[in-house]
Amino acid sequence: MTLTIKIGTLNDSDQSAVHNGTENGSDFRKITPTEEEICDDVVLLWKEEPGTEDATIQHLYDRITERNQSWKLSASRFRKILNEHHLYDTDLETVSLYKDKIHFPKALDSDAKVEVKFIDDEHGRGLFAKRDFSKGQIILKENKPIVYIPPLDKLFLISNGKACARCGKALYDLTQHKIMVHYLDCEVCKAIWCSEKCKKAHASLHELLYHSWRSNRIDILHAGNWKRFVNYCEKYCFTAAFSVGLIYGSMLLDTTGEVKEQWQKLASISQRERIKLRDASGIGSTFSLLNGTTVHTEEESDNGTKKGVEKNIDDETVWEKCYELFCGAFPKASEEIDFEKFLTMIGTFNINQYNGQVYHWISFINHDCEPNAYIEQVEEHEELRLHARKPIKKGEQIRITYVNPLHGVRLRRRELRVNWGFLCQCDRCQNELSTFERVPNLEKKNADANLGVEKIDSNDSSEDGSKKSTGNRKSSMREAQPDLKEILKNGKEFELDIPETVDTQGNVRKTSVRFDSNVSVAVDER
C-alpha cells in the first residue's frame, strides 16, 4: 500500500473553467440576476469587505461581477438598480424616512436608577440616568422579556421534545430521571421544559395554545388553528407574526393586565410603512431578516407533475393569509384587532425587539454610534444587563448602538434608515461623512453607460492632496486592521487584531491564523 500526499483546493476556489464560460468543454449559460439578488450581494460584500463600502461605483461593479461570473449584468443596469434602491446615494439626507410616522405613547416610567423622559416629537422618549455611573458599572437588569419568544427555527425540535418548550435550549444533557422527578414534561404532548423555572413561566400558555380543549378555552383559542398559524409563520420565516401571536395569547391569560400595559407603552409603526424602505430581501439585506422580511416563495407544480419551482409572493398576500390564520386561532381577535392593527403590532415588535425579545426598559433606549452603554445577555438570552461603557453623569441620556459599530458610516446609516426609520446625526457620523467627496446627484443622472466614475488607485495622490481614494477612509475602530483581501491572496500566516487571552500561568497570548486555499490530503493508492 502506498500513501501519497496530494494538494487539493478548498471551497471551489479553482473554478476557472466554469467562471470563464465553459464547463466540461460546453458553453456555460449566463443568467440575468434579479434586482433583489444584486442588492443582496452588494450589501453582503460590504459586510464581508467593509473597505468596499467607500469604493467608487465602477470598482463596486467590478467586484460584484468578479464574485458572480455567471451573471449577465451591464454596468448601466447595475448603477440604475443601486440608485433606485438607494444603495449608492452620496446624499442619504434626500431619501425617505418613516420616523415621523412612528407613534410614541406619552407613558413614562422610572425606578431608583433610571427614568424615561419625553424628549420631543422627533426623538420620542429616552432613558436617563438618575445618578452617576462609573465605567463598567451595571445600570440596570431586566430579568425577563415582556413575553419570552422561542426561536422560530427551533419549533421542530421543541415539538419533538428535543428542545425546551419555552426557551428553545437543547435538552441533550437533561436525563429522563430529572424529567420525571421534576415533572418537566407535558402530560399530553412531547413538549419538555429545561427547568422548573421555564415550566412555571410557560406551562399555562402552552396549555392554552396546544391543549385548549382540556381547559374548555376553545372560545378564546382554537389549538388546531394555532398550529396552522405557526406552520405558516415557519414556512415564510415570519418571526414577527409568530411573536405577535404569542404576545396576544399571553395577554388573554394575564389576569393582572401587565403584559398588555407594557405592550401599549411601546413605540408603534405599521409594517406596511417599514416595508416601503426595504432595499433588499435576502442574506445580504440591510433590512434585518429577524424583522420578518425574507423573500416569500412557495412551491408551484407544473401540470401537476413537476414540483419545486418557486414563485415569489408579495408581502400583502402573506400578511393577509397570516391575519386570516391569526383570527382563526383566536376566534375573538377580529373584534378588537383588524388587519391594519395586526400590521401595526408586527411593526411594533420589529422596532422594539432586541435579539428576538421585547424588554420593557431596553425598548426606551435610543441609538448612538459611540454609545455610553452596552448590553450583556445572560441566562440563555433571557436576562439583560445594561452596563456603562463610559462614565455617565446624573441626568445624562443613556444610549446603546443598534448596529455594528465596525461598519462604515454609509452602511450604519442605511441599516438605521431601513430598520428604524431614521438617519443618525451623531458626532461620529458627521465626522465620517465630512471625509467623503460628495458626488452631486446631477452628475449621477448624467453619467454615461460606463458609469462616468473614474476608478482611483488607492496609492495615487496629487501634490495638493485633492485627489484621494475614498477607500482610504476607515473608522477609528478598524483602521489598524490588515488588508485581508491581499493577505488571503498570498496565503500567508498573519496575526489578527483580536482580544488578547491570558492563560492559567498569567501569560498573555494571541491567536495566529493561517488562511490558504489549499489543503493536504493523504490518499491511499492500492
UniProtKB/Swiss-Prot annotation:
InterPro entries linked to this entry: SET_dom, SET_dom_sf
UniProt keyword tRNA processing present: no
Disulfide topology: none
Pfam family, one: SET
Effect annotated for changing Y402A: Abolished histone methyltransferase activity
Keywords, comma-separated and alphabetical: Chromosome, Cytoplasm, Methyltransferase, Nucleus, Phosphoprotein, S-adenosyl-L-methionine, Transferase
GO biological process, one term: methylation
UniProt xrefs under CDD domains: SET_SMYD (cd20071)
Catalyses which reaction(s): L-lysyl-[histone] + S-adenosyl-L-methionine = N(6)-methyl-L-lysyl-[histone] + S-adenosyl-L-homocysteine + H(+)
GO MF term set: histone methyltransferase activity; S-adenosylmethionine-dependent methyltransferase activity
Presence of the UniProt keyword Protein transport in the record: no
Subcellular locations according to the entry: Nucleus; Chromosome; Cytoplasm
UniProt GO cellular component terms: chromatin; cytoplasm; nucleus
Basic and acidic residues bias locations: 476-492
SET domain boundaries: 112-403
Record SMART domains: SET
Further remarks about this protein from its record: Present with 5000 molecules/cell in log phase SD medium.
Function as written in the Swiss-Prot or TrEMBL entry: Histone methyltransferase that monomethylates 'Lys-5', 'Lys-8' and 'Lys-12' of histone H4 (H4K5me1, H4K8me1 and H4K12me1, respectively), thereby controlling gene expression and remodeling chromatin structures. Functions together with the chromatin-modifying complexes COMPASS and NuA4 to regulate cell growth and stress responses. (Microbial infection) Acts as a virus host factor involved in the replication of positive-strand RNA viruses like the MBV.
Protein name per UniProt: Histone-lysine N-methyltransferase SET5
Organism: Saccharomyces cerevisiae (strain ATCC 204508 / S288c)
